[in-house]
């Protein structure tokens, strides 16, 4: 490795998963490929009419979910936990799948596996940026202490207690990431910070929670 004129070894980025699901482990290759789609995603949402259309889907999706038996709070919190799966759903509703595929296809993504890779990358990115106090707070939530407090005191109606429980679970899941995924994301934290900052608080009208 230290010999004169020795060629640097190519970094092992791991296996590139081309048909990712919600349970497929992240690799550095997956994270790098996702990052390479972010400039195209930013260009995709640069048109004002596109933004307006996708924002309008927020209410329509909540209405549709509620009509199909999904609690409106759950519908919104699913968007908070998995924003990229919500974006994929909006793209399908808007009939823009082929247009979006031109962006993510450059990295050999399909729409659904791009969404899964995106959501797992964001969760791992959030998790790797947690401080000690935030980790402690999450552990308190995971152990159910907040649930017990909500049930113990009679300040809330049953509906309000259920809403609080949904929210607590959503907070936990927003930062839920395993060690493998976090290690895949860690080398790209700076690049992710730079690329994601251009979106601000949302992507295509979908809330984006960043560290």
What does each model-identified segment do?
Residues 2-72, 173-177, 181-183, 187-190, ...:
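Immediate post-signal-peptide N-terminus of mature secreted/exported proteins
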Residues 13-17, 21-24, 83, 87, ...:
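A near-ubiquitous, low-amplitude feature marking generic local secondary-structure context
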Residues 45, 53, 85, 99-101, ...:
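Residue-identity detector for glutamine
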Residues 72-158:
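Mature extracellular/secreted ectodomains of secretory-pathway proteins
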């Amino acid at each position: 490795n230290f010999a004169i004129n020795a060629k640097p070894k190519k970094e092992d980025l791991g296996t590139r998963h081309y048909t990712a699901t919600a349970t497929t482990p992240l690799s550095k290759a997956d994270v790098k490929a996702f990052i390479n789609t972010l400039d195209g995603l930013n260009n995709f949402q640069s048109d004002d009419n596109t933004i307006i259309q996708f924002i309008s889907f927020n209410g329509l999706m909540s209405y549709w979910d509620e009509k199909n038996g999904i609690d409106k709070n759950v519908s919104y919190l699913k968007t908070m936990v998995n924003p990229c799966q919500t974006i994929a759903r909006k793209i399908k509703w808007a009939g823009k799948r082929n247009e979006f595929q031109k962006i993510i296809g450059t990295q050999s993504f399909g729409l659904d596996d791009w969404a899964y890779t995106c959501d797992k990358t964001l969760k791992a990115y959030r998790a790797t940026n947690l401080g000690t106090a935030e980790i402690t707070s999450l552990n308190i939530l995971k152990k159910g202490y907040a649930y017990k407090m909500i049930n113990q005191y009679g300040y809330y109606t049953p509906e309000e207690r259920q809403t609080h429980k949904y929210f607590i679970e959503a907070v936990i899941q927003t930062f839920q990431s395993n060690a493998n995924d976090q290690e895949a994301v860690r080398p790209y934290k700076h690049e992710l910070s730079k690329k994601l900052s251009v979106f601000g608080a949302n992507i295509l009208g979908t809330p984006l929670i960043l560290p």
